[in-house]
Amino acid sequence: MTSKLPSILSATEEDIQLLLAAQCHIGTKNCDKQMEPYVWKRRADGIHILNIGKTWEKLVLAARIIAAVENPNDICVISARPYGHRAVLKFAANTGAQAIAGRFTPGSFTNYITRSFKEPRIIIVTDPRVDHQAIREASYVNIPVIALCDTDAPLQFVDVAIPTNNKTRHSIGLIWWLLAREVLRLRGTIPRTPDGWNVMVDMFFYRDPEEVEKQQQEEAAAKAAAAAGAEEAPAGLSEWDVSSAPQAGSINPALVSGEGALDWSADNAGPSDWAADTTTAAGWGAETTGTGGWD
């Protein structure tokens, strides 16, 4: 199929490989009547296959619409689907848009009394089925809507539909990453080169909180084990090492003063030979040798 885009906006081989690897072309078994122009064929198992060429054309069209908005803060990106929470937050952080990740508060576009009231010039939603409340309120106040649409998505009140798989974490993250990159390229923020943007597509993928917590615990345990190993005493030295203690039968160093004389004010070390007979002084000058009995 011949692309209607200028050569500079045409998809590269790497972009097509990314779209196929993320399974952005895999649709559902159901197909809405208005989504039929974007369907390439239907597999034997009933799954509809989307046309990747039309996906890229609509992606570039949406990027050119977004880049035409002067104030980036007038763009609102919405995702009530959990797989799109991280993607819309990263998109908003890189392009300056407002992000609503999670439940959309009813009245955010129509009730000016609410704290979450917004007046965007354009909104981008991840799934028209899940984000139907935001699309309906946008239709009340004439806000254009760009949506990531699967084959079973209703296109009512949707102005620009990007045909893609909006059910998996990789396809959602990749489309938001490509959209953010194309917007920055059209604004002139980054060059149109393969290595012009240093943000990896992995940063837009959803991560399970339990997996993140488990990974953090493993990293903390590894750091604790490394710190404990560094604090261990060197080999050959331990608290049970008695090589530095005085040998049996020698004079206690605590009794010896600086001049080499015995210091009797120090604690008595006691006899060195515990197997010898005890000798005590019985009188003023006489010495008696104690015996083992009373006689």
From Swiss-Prot:
State the Pfam families in the record. 40S_SA_C (PF16122), Ribosomal_S2 (PF00318)
Where is the stretch described as Disordered? 222-244, 262-295
Record's keyword terms, sorted: Cytoplasm, Ribonucleoprotein, Ribosomal protein
**Entry GO MF terms:** structural constituent of ribosome
Q: Low complexity bias located where? A: 222-236, 273-289
Q: Where in the cell is it found?
A: Cytoplasm
Among InterPro entries, the record links this protein to: Ribosomal_uS2, Ribosomal_uS2_C, Ribosomal_uS2_CS, Ribosomal_uS2_euk, Ribosomal_uS2_euk/arc, Ribosomal_uS2_flav_dom_sf
Q: Which GO terms describe its cellular component?
A: cytosolic small ribosomal subunit
Protein family (similarity comment): Belongs to the universal ribosomal protein uS2 family.
Job of this protein:
Required for the assembly and/or stability of the 40S ribosomal subunit. Required for the processing of the 20S rRNA-precursor to mature 18S rRNA in a late step of the maturation of 40S ribosomal subunits.
Q: How is this protein organized at the quaternary level?
A: Component of the small ribosomal subunit. Mature ribosomes consist of a small (40S) and a large (60S) subunit. The 40S subunit contains about 33 different proteins and 1 molecule of RNA (18S). The 60S subunit contains about 49 different proteins and 3 molecules of RNA (25S, 5.8S and 5S). Interacts with RPS21.
UniProt name for this protein: Small ribosomal subunit protein uS2
- Gene it is expressed from: RPS0
